[in-house]
Amino acid sequence: MARKPASSQDFETTLAKLENIVAHLENGDLPLEEALKEFEQGVQLAKLGQERLQQAEQRIQILLQKTEDAPLNDYKGNDYEGNA
């Protein structure tokens, strides 16, 4: 019986499981009921992967906004020639 995807797994694990399911389904040698269960799990994994990508995109947008809003100051440290 196919397991439901854990919501805490990372994107790479989700993608690997989804690729494995796709390979099984493309083989065409699964009985109908098992193929349907695999397909259902694949849909859940695809949804989870999409959510992970959207979360990552939102985090990137937040980081970029913080960077754009931050003032740029001249560096006051030593230069490469040893001068202060």
UniProtKB/Swiss-Prot annotation:
GO MF terms held by the record: exodeoxyribonuclease VII activity
Q: Which GO terms describe its cellular component?
A: cytosol; exodeoxyribonuclease VII complex
Q: Which organism is it from?
A: Haemophilus influenzae (strain PittEE)
Quaternary structure per UniProt? Answer: Heterooligomer composed of large and small subunits.
Keyword hit for Ribonucleoprotein: no
* Enzyme Commission no: 3.1.11.6
The alphabetized list of GO BP terms reads: DNA catabolic process
Kindly give the Gene3D superfamilies that the UniProt entry links to this protein. Answer: Exonuclease VII, small subunit
Name the chain's protein: Exodeoxyribonuclease 7 small subunit
The listed locations are:
Cytoplasm
